[in-house]
């Protein structure tokens, strides 16, 4: 049974056993574009990927299922070489405040593509992690500070979004996955915490 057949079964909930780890060649393969109309499997896959992210951010479900928290997942991480990503960034609010929306960014993206980006680069101050990497890799992961991304939803409708800050980093990390790139490829090997002119450090 193929990975997509197993994962899209009605009763299946994606867990850490479904996520392949670094060293698997699928993570180094440029994934194939999906064609529209999508197959039922491709639609269900996107929904299950989003469901996994919601479970991973729910303390009760995460503990019950043994999940690491995640804000993004790409189909290649499930050993499915298709250009499908899911991103789920919670709204961080000050103590005592009530968020307007639970999530700052919530999207299942088919064939996402960066169509323009800022000259300025940015990196998370605490570095990045990955559900497919079971080790800490310290260093600044240098990315674009701002990006414009085109993608299609499950109905084949095209969307264009402009992203900055943390949301921009998350989407770039997932788009890297569909291009066979790992986050640590973007860390300066000789000097992991090198700060070049104009690099924006996001705390």
UniProtKB/Swiss-Prot annotation:
Query: Where does the chain bind Fe cation?
Result: 130, 173, 177
This protein's gene is called def
The UniProt record lists the EC number as 3.5.1.88
The top EC class, named as a word, is hydrolase
The cross-references to PANTHER family, in alphabetical order and at most eight, read: PEPTIDE DEFORMYLASE, PEPTIDE DEFORMYLASE 2
- Which residues belong to the signal peptide in this entry? none
Listed under GO biological process in this entry are: co-translational protein modification; translation
Whether Iron counts among this entry's keywords is yes
InterPro entries listed in its UniProt record: Peptide_deformylase (IPR023635), Peptide_deformylase_sf (IPR036821)
Q: To which species is this protein native?
A: Streptococcus pneumoniae (strain ATCC BAA-255 / R6)
Which family does this protein fall into? Answer: Belongs to the polypeptide deformylase family.
Q: Which keywords has UniProt assigned to this entry? A: Hydrolase, Iron, Metal-binding, Protein biosynthesis
The active site consists of: 174
Reactions it catalyzes: N-terminal N-formyl-L-methionyl-[peptide] + H2O = N-terminal L-methionyl-[peptide] + formate
Could you give the cofactor binding note from the entry? Binds 1 Fe(2+) ion.
Essential cofactor(s): Fe(2+)
GO molecular-function annotation terms?
metal ion binding; peptide deformylase activity
This protein's name: Peptide deformylase
So what does this one do? Removes the formyl group from the N-terminal Met of newly synthesized proteins. Requires at least a dipeptide for an efficient rate of reaction. N-terminal L-methionine is a prerequisite for activity but the enzyme has broad specificity at other positions.
């Amino acid at each position: 049974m193929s990975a997509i057949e197993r994962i899209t079964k009605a009763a299946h909930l994606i867990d850490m056993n479904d996520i392949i780890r670094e060293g698997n060649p699928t993570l180094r393969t440029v994934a194939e574009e999906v064609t529209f109309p999508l197959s039922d499997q491709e639609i269900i896959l996107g929904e299950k990927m989003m469901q996994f992210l919601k479970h991973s951010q729910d303390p009760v479900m995460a503990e019950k299922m043994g999940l690491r928290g995640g804000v993004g997942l790409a189909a290649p991480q499930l050993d499915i070489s298709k250009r499908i990503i899911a991103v789920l960034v919670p709204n961080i609010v000050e103590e005592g405040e009530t968020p307007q929306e639970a999530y700052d960014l919530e999207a299942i993206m088919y064939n996402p593509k960066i169509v323009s980006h800022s000259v300025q680069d940015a990196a998370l101050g605490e570095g990045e992690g990955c559900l497919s990497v079971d080790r800490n890799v310290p260093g600044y992961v240098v990315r674009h500070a701002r990006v414009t991304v085109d993608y299609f939803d499950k109905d084949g409708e095209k969307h264009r979004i402009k992203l900055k800050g943390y949301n921009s980093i998350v989407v770039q990390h997932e788009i890297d996955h569909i291009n066979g790139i790992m986050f640590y490829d973007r860390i300066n090997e000789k000097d992991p915490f090198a700060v070049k002119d104009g690099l924006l450090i996001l705390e």
